Each structure stands twice: as structure tokens, then as C-alpha cells.
Amino acid sequence: MTVQTFIPNGAKAASENTVTQPTHTTDVSIKKLYIETQGCQMNEYDSHRMADLLGDSHGYVLTNNPNEADILLMNTCSIREKAQEKVFSELGRWRKLKEQNPDLVIGVGGCVASQEGDNIQKRAPYVDMIFGPQTLHRLPQMLDQHHAQVEKPKKEKIKLVDISFPDIEKFDFLPEPRVEGFKAFVSIMEGCSKYCSFCVVPYTRGEEVSRPLDDVLAEIAGLAEKGVREISLLGQNVNGYRGETFEGGICTFPELLRLVAEIPGIGRLRYTTSHPLEFSDELIQCYEDLPQMVSHLHLPVQSGSNDVLKAMKRNHTIDVYIDKIAKLRKIRPDMHLSSDFIIGFPGETDENFAETLQFIKDLDFDHSYSFVYSKRPGTPASDLPDTTPEHVKKERLAQVQQVIKQSSIEKTDAMLGKIERVLIEKVSDQDPNILVGTADNTRLVTFVGDASWIGRFAEIEITEIKTLNLVYGELLNLEPDVA
């Protein structure tokens, strides 16, 4: 099996002009759609697909202004209690807009929608549609149903709530994705089957289901043809991908990476979010074999204490995690590592936290998504006794974030004098002679160059550190277009 099977006929290098920008409008005669996205990159991807879907089916175009929208959609996150309460706070503001414009349609999707269902309408009865992550492709039909029953008496109206977990069918009904620059997210699987004791994802997005291999490769090949040069593969447990092949076999995540790397035009590969249990030797080998793999990895560990990991039901030890990172850094010594940390998990002792803090220092993390533990209803951890005072949890969190911030500063400073491979993305807003791009480690890199280089990769020597995430440099080599 080769990747050529999945590349559209006539695929070729795309010029800068093939990359379309987001469609926004101020024309009052055009139907307008506003989407608020909360949470993870999966939600970002889903929101883009909602816009594609309603644009294709009903002619809606995106607006940045909710006050001028005909439809307001909220793509929600339930990973933490604060995020969930933010949903109803924002809906309260949207209620005022609906009072001013009774024809305004309000829809709630994402994980809070999946978790709460029609309870959302009980608390916010002005919400017209509720849909889950796996049913967003049914939005056009739900919208039609809404308009068809607008004039009906309230008692005759059907509640428009669809939060089911059908087989991974939504991708069969989504239009071709719109391209917005030289980077793109591609969702390759949905859900998670790990059932960590703190996590709502298996309950809000369902069990792990992988997209068929040919669907994934065809989407990526189509994006490459339109000028996309960097692909980020998405999934709640992305390295657990097990996609069915057209021959009836199963493609693993490392095998998928190797096939994607063969697609003309794709010069850089990222992925998120992964689980340590399935961060295999085969996956690590891809970092040695595939130059498209970036030297940046987000691998959530959640805690540096084995006792806490056991309570979290992570099913691995700290030594397992350390061993995998050691193997990876033997291949890529410059690997930048980020992770997730939950601080103040029920039962976390001072000793447990000290272990976590030392672990963070030892592994030299570049970045983290770190939060104080938030109890989520229906999860096993919600029944655990929690005796740690909130102020102690916040103090611990501050220590973690300070250690990681200092490590990040040091890693940025260490870039001085080094050569970075940069994807050139745009002209600077401040100076038309300055180009802006992204390094493997996600830092923004600016340098003097020509706008015709946009969309290509370049080797840049870093000459000045400006901020934590911004560096200056000089061009050493402009790579040919990778298409």
C-alpha cells in the first residue's frame, strides 16, 4: 500500500493564491454565523467544520460580531467546572440579543451539550438547538426543523436535541474543508476509552473510534493541494488510532504518520493529544525516520507521583514515562516537551506534590496546561474525599507554573545562535519587509525577506531573543517548495 492511492488526480504544488482566508462580512443582506469556541483543538477543528457545513448548505458566512449574527453557536468544553459555568454566563448575554431579535437562532454544541442535553434548555429555554460533538453534521437538518416549527404553538414544538454517539459518520457528511493559511488540523479519531478517574471525555465524546485510513489521507492530500504545509493530527487519544484500510486491515498511528509523510506538500507533522501508554517504540522510531516530525511533543502525564497516577487510573508509572522520553531525546536531543498537570487531585499529599515538582524539573518541560483539580460529575474521582484546602492547591499550582515558565525562558534563550527550520506564514503587520513564521518548537520567528517566500520553509539563524515566544533571525537557506 502506498500513499499515491489517496492523492487526488492532478495534485500539484499550490501557489500562495490557492490559500483562501476566513470569510467574514459586514454586508447586512448576507446571512451571518457567529461561533464561540471553548476548550481544546478538537473543538477548534469542529467549529471550522460547522462553519464549512452551514456555509455550504445554507450560505452562512462567518462574522466576528455576535450582535450582527443570524445564528449564534457555542462549541463548549466541560473539562473543568469553571468552563462549564462560563457557558451559562455567555448564554445569559446571548439571551439579551435574542430579546432584541426574536428570529435569532441559538445553538449549543460540544461537550457541555453532550453532558447536559435538554437540561440546557431547562436552564436557558431560549436555546433552540443542542447537538453533541458526534452529531454536528446534522446541524443543517436541525436548522431546517427549527425554521419549520417557528410559528407552531410551544406545546407542538419538537425539542431539537441530538447528543447521540452514532458511528463515526459525521465526516461522511461534511463538505471539503476550507483552507485558512498554511496549517491545518485534521481529526483522525473521536472519543477515548481510557476512562481516567477524573475525565469526562469518554462520557461526552464516547469511546474511541478511528476514521478510515483512506478518508484521512484523502483529506490531507486535498489540503496539501491547496497549499497547506503543516498538518496537526487530532484525537483525544491520537496515538491510539486504529484506522481501517481499504483492504480491510488496520493502520496504526505510526503507520499513518509514515503515509502522511509521503504526501507531496506536507513538510511538517504535529499531533495532539497522546497518551503515554501508547507512545510506542514504533512511534518513537518515526522521529528518527521522518524529517517532517517536529521536535516538539505534547504528552500529558497529569502528575509526577505514582500514588496520584494510580488514583487517577492512568495505568502507568512515572518510570514508564521517563523511559519513553529518554528514548525520544536520544533520537532528538533538542526535543521540546509539554504536558498536562492536575494539581490538588483528591488525596495528593505534600510528599506527592514534591514528587511532581521534582519530576517537572527533571524532565525540563517547555510548556504545560496546568490547573487545580476540578470535580466533574459522574466521574469516579468525584466520589473521592478531598481534604486539601483550595489555597494550598493554588499555591502548589503557582509553584508548578513558575518552574515551567523559567524552563521555557531558558529554552527560548538557548535558541540564540542556533539554526531553526521555520514555516513562513505571513508579512509582519508592523513592517512589510519583515516575514513571520513558526519554528518546530512553536516560537514565532521574524526576519527580513520577500513576501513571495510565504508558504515555504527556511533555515533561520536566531540572532536576538525578543520575548518568551518571539525571536529574530537571519535567513541562511530558503528551501524549495515541498510540493
Swiss-Prot record:
Keyword 4Fe-4S: yes
EC category name: transferase
Subcellular location: Cytoplasm
SUPFAM superfamilies named in the record: Radical SAM enzymes
Reactions this protein catalyses: N(6)-dimethylallyladenosine(37) in tRNA + (sulfur carrier)-SH + AH2 + 2 S-adenosyl-L-methionine = 2-methylsulfanyl-N(6)-dimethylallyladenosine(37) in tRNA + (sulfur carrier)-H + 5'-deoxyadenosine + L-methionine + A + S-adenosyl-L-homocysteine + 2 H(+)
Primary localisation category: cytoplasm
All residue ranges annotated as the TRAM domain in the record: 413-477
A GO term for molecular function: N6-isopentenyladenosine methylthiotransferase activity
Record EC number: 2.8.4.3
Record keywords, A-Z: 4Fe-4S, Cytoplasm, Iron, Iron-sulfur, Metal-binding, S-adenosyl-L-methionine, Transferase, tRNA processing
Reported cofactor(s): [4Fe-4S] cluster
General function of this protein: Catalyzes the methylthiolation of N6-(dimethylallyl)adenosine (i(6)A), leading to the formation of 2-methylthio-N6-(dimethylallyl)adenosine (ms(2)i(6)A) at position 37 in tRNAs that read codons beginning with uridine.
Similarity remark: Belongs to the methylthiotransferase family. MiaB subfamily.
Protein name: tRNA-2-methylthio-N(6)-dimethylallyladenosine synthase
The species this protein was found in: Acinetobacter baumannii (strain ACICU)
Phylogenetic placement of the source organism: Bacteria, Pseudomonadati, Pseudomonadota, Gammaproteobacteria, Moraxellales
